[in-house]
Every structure is written in C-alpha cells, then in structure tokens.
From Swiss-Prot:
InterPro entries: DnaJ_C3_Co-chaperones, DnaJ_domain, J_dom_sf, TPR-like_helical_dom_sf, TPR_rpt. Induction: Up-regulated during an endoplasmic reticulum stress. Involved in the unfolded protein response (UPR) during endoplasmic reticulum (ER) stress. Acts as a negative regulator of the EIF2AK4/GCN2 kinase activity by preventing the phosphorylation of eIF-2-alpha at 'Ser-52' and hence attenuating general protein synthesis under ER stress, hypothermic and amino acid starving stress conditions. Co-chaperone of HSPA8/HSC70, it stimulates its ATPase activity. May inhibit both the autophosphorylation of EIF2AK2/PKR and the ability of EIF2AK2 to catalyze phosphorylation of the EIF2A. May inhibit EIF2AK3/PERK activity. Residues 394-462 form the J domain. Residues 451-481 are annotated as: Disordered. PROSITE patterns: DNAJ_2, TPR, TPR_REGION. This is DnaJ homolog subfamily C member 3. The J domain mediates interaction with HSPA8. The modification Phosphoserine is found at S274.
Length: 504
C-alpha cells in the first residue's frame, strides 16, 4: 500500500495543477444532485489522498455513472489515471471536463501538458492560448506562457529534424529529435523517425529501444513490431525476433510481411534449438550438420554464418577433431578476432595437436577479454604445464600416437615398438644399451597411457613416473631398470613374461 501523502507529493512534482481538485468543493451538492454521487466523490478524494489509487478510481467510476454531467467526477478520475501513469485514459476525461465547464483553466492547462508530451503541438498551443484568454490565476498564466514558448520551440526543432532527415543528415536529425523527445516523450511518430535515423547510422539496438516505446504508445502498431523483429533477426537474436513477430501476428494474423518473416524465423529457430540439444547430448557430428543447415537456410545474414561456424568449431574441438576445429575456429577469428569462444575451442584443439605455444597464445588472448573465466585460467595453466612437460619425456611421442589415441591404438603401438627395440635384438653392446633405454621408455609409456588415472595426470601436465612432479617427494615408485623389465611380455595384458625372444 502506498503511504498517505506520497501520491500528493508525486502529483505535486509531475502534475501540479491537478492538486487543485483536492480543494474543489462538490458544487452539485448545493443543487440537490444525487447524494450517492457526492458520497462517491468524497470517499474517492480521501482514498486518493491516502494513495489507494485503485479504490479511488472505483469511486470516481461510480460517480461518473451516477452523474454523467458532473465535471468534478471526470476531473478527479483523470487525476487518478495520471497518478497511475495512464495518460491516454486521462485525456478523454479532461476533454469532457472542458466541454462541461469551458472556463475550467486547470483542466485545459493540464490537457495542454498532455498534448505537448504526445507531440500534438498545434492542439497544445491552442489550449495554452485559451488559458491565457480566460482570466487565469497568476500561476496559471505564468505556466501557460512558459509552455507556449516551449511548444513553439518544439515546432521549430521538429521542422529542423524533418529537413535534416530529408537531406539524409541523420546525425543532425538525431540531435534535433533528442531535444524534442525530452519534452514530447509520448510522441510515437518522432520515436519511429529517430529509430529510422539510428538504423541508417548503423545503431540497430538504439532503434529497437525507440521502436519498443512506439509500440506501446501507438495502439495496434504492427509496423513497429515487424521492424523490431527484423532488427533482432539481423543481429542474430532469433529468439527475440520470433517473440516480436508473434506480437505482430497477435494484432493482425493476416499481416503478410509478419507472417512470411515468422515462417523464416521459426524454421531457423527450430534448427538452432535442435543443434544445441544435440551438443548437450554430446552428438557433435549431428550438431555440426544442423548448423550447416542453418547457414544454408539464412546465407544472407552474416551473423548466422559466424555463430554457426563458432558452434561447429566448438563441436570439432569437443569431438577431438583438432585439424577441422583449428580450420573453422580460425575462420571465425578472421571475422571476429576477439571471439572468446573460438579462442578457447581453438586452444583446446591446439593442445590435442601438441601445439602448446599456439594454445597458450589463444588462452592469453581469451583471458584479456574475460579474465575471470575459470575455464580459460585452467586451460592456460594446463597448456603451460604441457609445454614444460613436452620439453621432457613425452609418452605420446615415445609411442608415436596422438594425444587423443584410443587404448587399443596405444597397445598396438607399444607391441610394435617393444618388438623393434627389445634388447635381445641387438648384439653390439652400445646398441644394446641404447635399446635398453628405448625399451624402458616404451614400457613406461605403455604403463602410463594404458592406465586411465595415470594418463589423466599426464594429460593434465603431471608425469606420474617423474619423482619431481609427484607432490610430497620420497622417490619414484614407478622407476624401472632394464633388469626389472626383462621377461616382460609386450603381447600380454599383464603378468610376467614366461619366455625370452630368440632370433636367428
């Protein structure tokens, strides 16, 4: 509930001349008019003073119904409408007051205020001039003169704005319109004109703001909803575009342009929603196909091409297809060098390709634009660890497999290399020592990469067989010498090797 007196202070600031109604005595009582009407008026006045606007409005509705020719009832109802922010509803009541009582200057002055805000300058000027001719109070006279000067200034500015617009000087037109709309805040046509200027100047979001205001100020404004929808569409915001075009069709279901646009946006929206659902389910190949369809469905709006490629880049990265990911992500970054999502996804692809310097560079670039992103921070730390690790022993390189190799590929590579570098194959002492070292590295690589837990540690930049990288120290529990690997069967999934190789 609004505190008593708050409505009075609000009206005093915004509609000072309406406060006169609180002191107006109901003249109809002296003429023997319906006592019920008087009761509604008095109760409504008390409720209005207490800030109970809805209840006050009900009382004034009843008073108008009881006495349709009572100007006080209309005036007080107009006051409530204005206090509720319903200027459209207040205007007819003020007009009725003036029709019933021509010399009621407070009502005419207030109507002039409303007409000025609506941009109806000729009508506003007419009201202010009539106030000055009707023997007004000193305060009313001063206010009418001030508003008349303001209305005249708005006429001049509007003429300049229209001339600038016709001359394609949209920057100047916007400057003039800015000044007018500070006063004529409810002028839908001027907001639509400024929106056109913003569109010409390449500022669609400012245009949308004006058009949204115009859609509320003018009833059944299908044109505004259509333009808002198309602007959102051009910006790549298909969901808001769909929402706005639906508002147009609610007003006119047969609107040809809105219906045609609706079908296009709905089709595109369905494809994108389907693609995102596939990504959530980890079905990256299918999602890629959907986004390729998006680009075919809307080839003329660059935003959808960029966004689609950005998501395809993400799919390739998550699906561990680094070559494709790097190619598509790079295309996105050529169009949008600061695209954080593309930078992150390309960095992940670089990690798979063991291009650590490039990954670090991408993560650092992404961090410049989003320094609080935990994923970027963790990715950068991982890339730095892997770079450091690559300068030491790299188990993937030892086995000659990619970082995203499956366990089966790892075992196959291990068996091949274990046979190739088994020390029994070498008779020369120097070659045998070299083979022993190679064989130990090959066996160590197999041990780490075939164990999910150990492999994860290594992938995160920590060598589980390196004592220096093990927290807590205390030596390397996985250290092996050649002797400990003798008798090891590279073709066994575990257990001791039961025989030695013999070569002719």
């Amino acid at each position: 509930m609004v505190a008593p007196g708050s409505v009075g202070s609000r009206l005093g600031a915004v509609f000072p001349f309406l406060l006169v109604l609180v002191d107006l005595q109901y003249e109809g009582a002296e003429c023997g008019v319906n006592a019920d009407v008087e009761k509604h008026l008095e109760l409504g006045k008390k409720l209005l003073a207490a800030g109970q606007l809805a209840d006050a409005l009900s009382q004034f509705h009843a008073a108008v119904d009881g006495d349709p020719d009572n100007y006080i009832a209309y005036y007080r109802r107009a006051t409530v409408f204005l206090a509720m922010g319903k200027s459209k509803a207040a205007l007819p009541d003020l007009t009725k007051v003036i029709a019933l009582k021509m010399d009621f200057t407070a009502a005419r002055l207030q109507r002039g205020h409303l007409l000025l805000k609506q941009g109806k300058l000729d009508e506003a000027e007419d009201d202010f001039k009539k106030v000055l001719k009707s023997n007004p109070s000193e305060q009313e006279e001063k206010e009418a003169e001030s508003q008349l000067v303001k209305a005249d200034e708005m006429q001049r500015l509007r003429s300049q704005a229209l001339d600038a617009f016709d001359g394609a000087d949209y920057t100047a037109a916007i400057t003039f319109l800015d000044k007018i709309l500070e006063v004529c805040v409810w002028d839908a046509e001027l907001r639509e004109l400024r929106a056109e200027c913003f569109i010409k100047e390449g500022e669609p979001r400012k245009a949308i703001s004006d058009l949204k205001a115009a859609s509320k100020l003018k009833s059944d404004n299908t044109e505004a909803f259509y333009k808002i929808s198309t602007l959102y569409y051009q910006l790549g915001d298909h969901e808001l575009s769909l929402s706005e075009v639906r508002e147009c069709l609610k007003l006119d279901q047969d609107h040809k342009r809105c219906f045609a646009h609706y079908k296009q946006v709905k089709k595109l929206n369905k494809l994108i929603e389907s693609a995102e659902e596939l990504i959530r389910d980890g079905r990256y190949t299918d999602a890629t196909s959907k986004y390729e369809s998006v680009m075919k469905t809307e080839p003329s709006v660059a935003e959808y091409t960029v966004r689609s490629k950005e998501r395809i880049c993400h799919c390739f990265s998550k699906d561990e297809k680094p070559v494709e990911a790097i190619r598509i992500c790079s295309e996105v970054l050529q169009m949008e060098p600061d695209n954080v999502n593309a930078l992150k996804d390309r960095a992940e692809a670089y990690l798979i390709e063991e291009m650590y310097d490039e990954a670090i560079q991408d993560y650092e670039a992404a961090q410049e634009h989003n320094e609080n992103d935990q994923q970027i921070r963790e990715g950068l730390e991982k890339a730095q660890r892997l770079l450091k690790q690559s300068q030491k022993r790299d188990y993937y390189k030892i086995l000659g497999v990619k970082r995203n190799a499956k366990k089966q590929e790892i075992i196959k590579a291990y068996r091949k290399l274990a046979l190739q570098w088994h020390p029994d194959n070498f008779q020369n002492e120097e070659e045998k020592k070299k083979a022993e070292k190679k064989f130990i590295d090959i066996a160590a690589a197999k041990e780490v990469l075939s164990d999910p837990e150990m492999r994860k540690k290594f992938d995160d930049g920590e060598d589980p067989l390196d004592a220096e990288s093990q927290q807590g120290g205390g030596g390397n529990p996985f250290h092996r010498s050649w002797n400990s690997w003798q008798g090891f069967n590279p073709f066994s999934s575990g257990g001791p090797f039961r025989f030695k190789f013999h070569f002719n």
